[in-house]
Amino acid sequence: PGKEFKVGKKHIISKMVDEVTEIFMGMGFSIAEGPEIETVRNNFDALNAPKDHPSRDMTDTFYITEDILLRTQTSPVQIRTMEEAVKDNDLPLKIIVPGRCFRSDSPDATHSPMFHQIEVLVVGKDITFTEFKGTMETFVKKLYGPETKTKFRPHNFPFTEPSAEIDVSCFKCGGAG
């Protein structure tokens, strides 16, 4: 008989993406994917990123040509998906967009030239911010447990209005420090 082969384990990021995806699919979302090599139009212009925004600089973005780059966020998939949905008259839309992103960052404890991002997008009529909050709170509690607390803070993202960031209590210590 041959030598026993040790089977590897799934990477922690892959496990997390699978878990997040499963939670959102359970809430009626579908997965949207797109290319990692993108156009300036989809990565910046269509997302209302100002022409002078620092993220467009050569020092922050990996440009392949003047108009082609490695995506800096998964948001270009939103543009592609929304354009397709409008063309096909396929609304409302509920998607989750997991994927790799690239930025010209110096590696440290909080930065990496390649990182993973997951975005959530809902497009439809009569959708309220309260429904968004409820969706995100449901997600957080399913991921970290029912006792997890959330706090929504207003934030400015050029491509969403209104915008918010979400703080989550520590799943390990419950916020005790």
Where are these regions (language model features)?
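Conserved oxyanion/phosphate-binding beta-strand-loop segments in alpha/beta enzyme cores
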Residues: 1
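TRNA-recognition modules of translation machinery and tRNA-sensing kinases, especially anticodon-binding
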Residues: 4-177
